[in-house]
Amino acid sequence: MSNTKPSIVFAHGLWADGSCFSRLISTLQAEGHEVVAAQNSLDTLKGDVAAVTRALGRVSSPAILVGHSYGGTVITAAGTDDRVAGLVYIAALAPDEDETSQSQQAKFPTTDVFAHIEVADGRVWLKPDGITCFAGDLSEQEQKLVWATQGVPDADLFNQRMDGTAWRSKPS
């Protein structure tokens, strides 16, 4: 589909999936943008970068990558792709080439949500009592849905290194 407006590819963070952008997607589509939300597995950073790169292949170029939370790390690496015109970070990590998500996050105060997690079976689970810290602006029904469908990251995900730092060469 040829388009005069840039395409938009979203990358979600922990305990979420691509549907977390559903309200934005509808609005952007109504404005004439091609929009895709990548579905990150949250197993490996390399795999999540590959998911965003695959999503880039489904839309016209140029594209804008939008990352939320850990999704910022993903777009920082995926954004080196020639089809990417720019990056948007929404309350997101944007590590430099010598950083990991964890080392960048360690520079800032810990958010309340991390008092409501449990590491089990090599995954980081959000406990039910943590949903208000994570999605407090949603209705109770929406919070329950987010908790029930949470994407559960690998416990080592934030320690994995990325290749490429797109914000050094692309508008951000």
Positions of PLM-derived features:
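Active-site catalytic motif of lipid deacylating hydrolases and related acyltransferases
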Residues: 4-61, 111
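Active-site signature of alpha/beta-hydrolase-fold catalytic machinery across serine-
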Residues: 23, 77-78
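Conserved serine/cysteine hydrolase catalytic core
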Residues: 48-49, 140-141, 148-172
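Pocket-forming structural segment of enzyme catalytic cores
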Residues: 120-149
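Flexible "cap/lid" loop of the alpha/beta hydrolase fold
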Residues: 80-131, 154-163
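Gly/Ala-rich beta-loop-alpha elbow adjacent to hydrolase catalytic centers
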Residues: 66-71, 75
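Glycine-rich His-Gly loop
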Residues: 11-13, 69, 92
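Short, conserved loop/helix-junction motifs that constitute active-site signature segments
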Residues: 3, 78-83, 164-170
